Amino acid sequence: TRALDNLEGVPGRLQHVADCANGAAVYVDYAHTPDALATVLTAMRPHASGKLGVVFGCGGDRDKGKRPQMGQVACELADDVIVTDDNPRSEEPSLIRAQALVGCPDADDVGDRAKAIDVAVARLQAGDVLIVAGKGHETGQTVKGEVRPFNDADEIRRAVREAGI
């Protein structure tokens, strides 16, 4: 991951957010379709000498058919999968996650996105790579018509700092 660490890219697109003292690395990516998620996970696999983890969700009021596909891609290409909320909009968040879990029944279901990031970061070991996917550069979480401040990169930095890794 050393070459990737020095790459200046587009915010929210394979954005390197944190290096952990234990040797793990964390990235944010906007991937929110099955193809995009597959591309990101496939691209990052060679950079994980340990496990490849992913935290992802599926947007509400959007293509419901892709939700199980997102889960399937995540479980096929990552070692550690957490399904979380990602702009549920007007839909019930737990139902959105349940549809993603159809494609990935062994994934962990952690609805609160900040908590999902906390859980994923706490699991990181030397050589692991974590991708937090779906929101990319977005600075809000849309729930029931309200946009609540939320930024994956900021949450990752907080989680790494609080975990002390």
Regions found by a protein language model. Give the residues of each.
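ATP-dependent carboxylate-amine ligase
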Residues: 2-165
